[in-house]
Amino acid sequence: MTERDQLIDLIRQRSFQYSKEPIFTLASGKKSNFYFNLKGVTYYPPGIVLIGALMYDKIQELNLDPAGIGGLTMGADPIAISVAYTSQLRGNPIDAFSVRKEPKAHGLRLPIEGNMEPGDPVIVIEDVVTTGGSTIKAINAVRDYGLEILSVIALLDRCEQNGRENIEACGVNVYSLLTINDFISQ
């Protein structure tokens, strides 16, 4: 079984819920027949290993050379850390960073935590893309901080509510490891 298939199985077991009736309320307020809470996998050791490997491989496949990888806390945090860890093991370190939902009210009041400097090339990541709203918030914060966005990579694209298109309208390419089609038949 491939690493990708293993990840799909883990998500099915730990993070995916389906109902014939649209009973799940999404962040957008829309009701859906299916729901993913990927934290059940992104914070689970076997999931961490698989996500780190698959995301790192995707970065290599796309021939990207980021200094950092991160996104809006907290969905992106374990993904960024798993990629950073994998990148170190493979001899090509990529720093993890986290975009705060609101800058701290004390200290340096940084909107981004990590070792990024203005001008650094980065990848913005997301756990689940639905409308693209949280990804766009991260993109805006990253750009305001002066980082250069190479692309967006999502763990899962729900392929609805124009999420991918909304993100691409910000002028960045969007890729995903998985889509809803990996979990339900159309």
Feature-to-residue mapping (PLM):
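Active-site-facing substrate-recognition patch
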Residues: M1-L62
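Short, glycine/charge-rich flexible loops or terminal/linker lids adjacent to PRPP-binding catalytic cores
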Residues: Y35, A80-I123, G133-I136
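Short glycine-rich phosphate-binding loop at a beta-alpha junction
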Residues: L64-G75, I153-A154
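Phosphate/pyrophosphate-binding loops at sites that engage ATP/ADP/AMP, CoA/4′-phosphopantetheine
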Residues: M55-A67, I139-Y145
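PRPP-dependent phosphoribosyltransferase catalytic core
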Residues: T2-Q13, I139-Q186
